Amino acid sequence: MSEAAHSGAAPADLVELGRIASAYGVKGWVKVQPHSAQAEVLRTVSHWWLTRPAPQAARDVVASVPRAYQVLQARVHGGAVVAQLAGIDDRDQAEALRGCFVQAARSAFPAPADDEYYWVDLIGCALYSDADGEPRLLGVVDEVFDNGAHAVLKVLRQQIQPGQPGPVPLLDPKGRPLEELVPFVRAHIRHVDLAARRIDSDWPLDY
């Protein structure tokens, strides 16, 4: 293991941002495939925490617990991010990191611009719609992804029912959660209140 990596206590707010796809060049750089279009975080944080998938952990290049690597340089390369990590000096060392998940502490993210949000912060928010004139719960955000044009919220449908202590999941006839895909665009999103974990929209409830 390189002395540049350390396995001290990992931050409690680690967020998975991508996965190392391969080595890049012959000087120890790695190529990362980001999980989202918000790859700028990979370029701006000072440390990545790498975790090897369980089936590969026996190789002991990176333990199954996160290990921190200092990011010396990072830049966008096509749809990927390439980076130089401290202590990774040749292609063999870089190839040994192939498959590792790349995480960073949420507290280390740069502040987003006005009216911009990190996708990880939207997950778990309740989505409401006032398409019928009054705010009604549509569901809870389970995932955010990019469809090539804009971000999309995958919402697990929920409903407030009398006598129930909280929202009740809506299921299809086979007992599977009902899902709704809602574009995260100004045309439909009216307000985001991260402190209240609430997003207001005008998305039709029966779209």
Curated annotation (Swiss-Prot):
Family classification: Belongs to the RimM family.
UniProt name for this protein: Ribosome maturation factor RimM
Pfam families: PRC_RimM, RimM
Main location (coarse class): cytoplasm
Locations listed in the record: Cytoplasm
Gene3D superfamilies from the UniProt entry: PRC-barrel domain, RimM
SUPFAM superfamilies assigned: PRC-barrel domain, Translation proteins
PANTHER family for the chain: RIBOSOME MATURATION FACTOR RIMM (PTHR33692:SF1)
Organism whose genome encodes this protein: Bordetella pertussis (strain Tohama I / ATCC BAA-589 / NCTC 13251)
One GO MF term attached to the UniProt entry: ribosome binding
GO cellular component labels: cytoplasm; ribosome
Subunit structure and binding partners: Binds ribosomal protein uS19.
Domain called PRC barrel: residue spans: 114-207
GO BP of this protein: ribosomal small subunit biogenesis; rRNA processing
Keywords assigned: Chaperone, Cytoplasm, Ribosome biogenesis, rRNA processing
InterPro entries: PRC_barrel-like_sf (IPR011033), PRC_RimM (IPR056792), RimM (IPR011961), RimM_N (IPR002676), RimM_N_sf (IPR036976), Transl_B-barrel_sf (IPR009000)
Summary of the function given for this chain in its UniProt record: An accessory protein needed during the final step in the assembly of 30S ribosomal subunit, possibly for assembly of the head region. Essential for efficient processing of 16S rRNA. May be needed both before and after RbfA during the maturation of 16S rRNA. It has affinity for free ribosomal 30S subunits but not for 70S ribosomes.
Domains (record comment): The PRC barrel domain binds ribosomal protein uS19.
